Amino acid sequence: MSNKILVVGAGFSGAVIARMLSEQGYLVDMIDKRDHIAGNAFDYHNAHNILVHQYGPHLFHTNNRSVFEFLSRFTEWVDYQHRVKAILEDGSLVTLPVNLETKDRVGEDKVIDTFIRPYSEKMWGLKLEEISPDIINRVPIRNDLNELYFPNDEFQAMPKAGYTALFEKMLQHPTIQVKLGTHFQKEMEADYAHVFNSMPIDEYYDYCLGPLPYRSLKFHHVDLPIPRIFPVCQVNFTNDGPYTRVVEWKNIPNSPQNPQYTSLTYEEPCSYTENNNERFYPVKDASGKNRELYLAYKAMENPKTTFIGRLGQYVYLDMHQVVSSSMAIAEKFLKENPL
């Protein structure tokens, strides 16, 4: 049996699988259409030496010790407990997720229409009633005064040198070869024993059953010659403007602190067709039709290909869930295909 593996996509799903297989003797070729590794977790130091996440904030949190220990092989950590504020019409800030203090400020009867409806409808391009409750319930409404966004997760931290540095170490292995700026072609499959593919599954099958709906994001990066604007990293908007939230990067403690400048990123949701076909989020609708279409594509999967990640599996996953899922996929493959 050949021990050559192709991994399509250099994000978390692909990198975890590549590392685990390479450590068991497989020769792994990794390709990515972008010009960088780390997928949507890619970060970089901008002109003011502030650490910016190119594709929006990636905040690591989990209760899964095995995930934390696996990633800890490739990074040191800086403790960080995420806090979020929402800006009201009068410019004042209140805590999210909604807690007792926030409910007292705006009135309990206005919580849904102030915080949940405008953000969710902009994010998903659907009316609130059309969005799956699973998505809506990701942001709870609390009956206490807790201000932590992830109050129940044991491990909450940021990679000390950033995510890109973490990926560089994870992919630094003699049997992993990475080629960037390289698009997947089906003809490549013939050279490999197996392919782990993180591309959109409907695109792989040339949309033969119809396109799967995805949402995208446009990121507007801004540098300002002032020390700081907000007391927290993330501020959500409650108005009907185009943006869902703004992130002030120096409020994440693994970023260098420039006393003269601050850097912000505004997020504007849109259809992926309006953003160079950049897909970020599978759309989980209340009717379940999108899931049914994905399963029809999934049924076409051939034994030499495994679809991975958010786009390949058409599922909304946090980082720790992507890592856990990818570890399980790699372990299953290694058990069934020992060298």
Whereabouts are the PLM-identified features?
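Active-site/ligand-binding neighborhood in enzyme catalytic cores
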Residues: 90-194, 198-207
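Glycine-rich FAD pyrophosphate-binding loop
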Residues: 22-47
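Dinucleotide-binding Rossmann-like beta1-alpha1 core, especially the glycine-rich loop
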Residues: 48-110
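Short, well-ordered alpha-helix to beta-strand connector turns
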Residues: 3, 25, 174, 191-193, ...
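C-terminal segments that line or cap access tunnels to active or ligand-binding sites in enzymes
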Residues: 192, 203-339
